[in-house]
Amino acid sequence: PAIERGLAITAGQPVTVDDTWEQPWGERRFIRNHYNEWRVTYAERSGLQRRVDVVFRLYDDGLGFRYEFPDQPALKTVRIGSEITEFNLAENGEALWCPAWEWNREEYLYSRTPVDAVGSAQTPMTVKGRSGLHVSIHEAACIDYAGMNLRRSEGTSFRAQLTPGLTNAAVVRQAPFNTPWRTLQISDSAAGLIDSSLILNLNEPNKLGDVSWFKPMKYVGVWWEMHLEL
């Protein structure tokens, strides 16, 4: 049965982390990882007494949140048909977005429209408010999980929509596991979004060991050549 009713909500104490890690290569060698974390637990008051944690990490340049399914006797296999994650934008700003769920291909050119003209969008979707504030909605650490698109539900509100699986469930995982981070990068300018390290910080650390043999290269993909008729 779904975990959705008769839930008790408890919140832990905020935790602050401030450290620095080194990239094997990239725009910057050292990345500062500075955030405040807050964990909220939702637990069934009766019955199976299953629990789900929602973890928030707040950075100077935005925030990320994810759902965590701890190891517990009454929850072994988790089947996720959809998420009820929503993003409610305060105003009808200007959106830079690429369509999702079109019938003939996955890649499209980006459109620049009012937010309420968006139907379904791939992420990242970027919105510029009337004050010039920029917000980019995306995800991080998407590992063994369905990709997230956005479908406008009404007005300037969007709901996360998972890429379908082969069954009724978009995701089937064994507990314990975590969903990807849902991310909001926030900046006073578009350039500030490019400078943000939020998604890098929320991605999983390197698990490959020695990666010194990785070498940066330039690559031109065939699909973009077709788009540009090269």
Listing of model-derived features with the role each one plays in the protein:
Residues 206-212, 220-230:
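Catalytic cores of extracellular degradative/oxidative enzymes
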Residues 180, 217-221:
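Structural preference for beta-strand elements that scaffold enzyme active sites
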Residues 1-213:
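N-terminal accessory beta-strand-rich subdomains and adjacent acidic, glycine-rich linkers
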